[in-house]
C-alpha cells in the first residue's frame, strides 16, 4: 500500500494517476478537501479515498500499518498569502498534522517522501520566516533532520517550484499563480 496525503489535490491526484498506471500498489488517499476536490479522484479499484486530517493518521491507518510501503506527504496547507489569513489552519496542518505523519512513519518503519517548498529556501534560506507557511515548512525540514540524527529515520524530500498541469487550481483563494494566469488567458 502507498499512502498519499493530499491525494485529492493537484499534485497528489497526478501522483495517484501515475502510480495506478505504473505500479501494482494499492493506494490510500488521505485528504481533508480544504483545497482538494472529488473531481480529482482517479476511479480505480486500487484507490481508496478517505476524508480526514493528517493529525488523525495514526488511529485511521493503524490497521494498515504493516502493509504500508511508503507515504507521500503532500497534504499540507500550501499557500503563502492564505497562511497569513488562516494561520491557525496552516499551523494545524503543517505542524500538528505533519508531526503525526512523521511519528506514524517513524513508529512503523514506513518510508516517507516529504513535499518541501521553495518558499523556505529563497534568498539563501533567509526567507524561511517570511510567512507562516514558509516557517512551518522549514521547521518540518529541521524536524526531519533531527529525526534522522536521533532515530536514523530515513526520508526523501522533493521540492516543487510553481508546478502546473492537469487538476491545478485556477480560481478562488487557493489558486496557483500559474493557474490564475491560465484562467485569465483562456
Predicted regions and their residues:
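Glycine/proline-rich active-site loop of Rossmann-fold NAD(P)-dependent oxidoreductases
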Residues: 138, 151, 163-179, 186
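N-terminal Rossmann-like NAD(P)+-binding domain of SDR-like oxidoreductases, especially those catalyzing
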Residues: 1-163
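Conserved catalytic core of Hanks-type protein kinase domains
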Residues: 74, 184-185
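Hydrophobic residues in alpha-helical segments
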Residues: 84, 185-186
Amino acid at each position: 500500500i502507498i499512502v498519499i496525503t493530499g491525494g485529492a489535490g493537484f499534485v497528489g491526484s497526478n501522483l495517484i494517476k501515475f502510480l495506478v498506471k505504473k505500479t501494482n500498489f494499492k493506494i490510500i488517499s488521505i485528504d481533508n478537501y480544504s483545497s482538494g476536490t472529488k473531481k480529482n479522484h482517479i476511479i480505480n479499484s486500487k484507490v481508496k479515498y478517505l476524508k480526514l486530517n493528517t493529525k488523525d493518521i495514526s488511529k485511521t491507518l493503524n490497521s494498515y500499518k504493516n502493509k504500508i510501503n511508503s507515504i507521500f506527504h503532500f497534504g499540507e496547507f500550501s499557500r503563502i498569502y492564505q497562511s497569513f489569513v488562516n494561520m491557525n489552519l496552516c499551523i494545524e496542518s503543517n505542524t500538528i498534522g505533519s508531526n503525526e505523519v512523521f511519528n506514524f512513519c517513524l513508529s512503523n518503519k514506513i518510508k516517507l517522501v516529504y513535499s518541501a517548498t521553495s518558499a523556505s529556501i529563497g534568498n539563501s534560506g533567509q526567507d524561511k520566516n517570511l510567512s507562516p507557511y514558509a516557517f512551518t515548512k522549514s521547521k518540518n525540514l529541521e524536524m526531519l533532520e533531527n529525526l534522522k540524527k536521533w532515530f536514523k529515520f530515513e526520508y526523501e524530500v522533493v521540492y516543487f517550484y510553481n508546478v502546473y498541469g492537469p487538476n491545478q487550481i485556477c480560481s478562488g483563494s487557493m489558486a496557483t499563480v500559474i493557474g490564475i494566469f491560465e484562467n485569465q488567458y483562456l
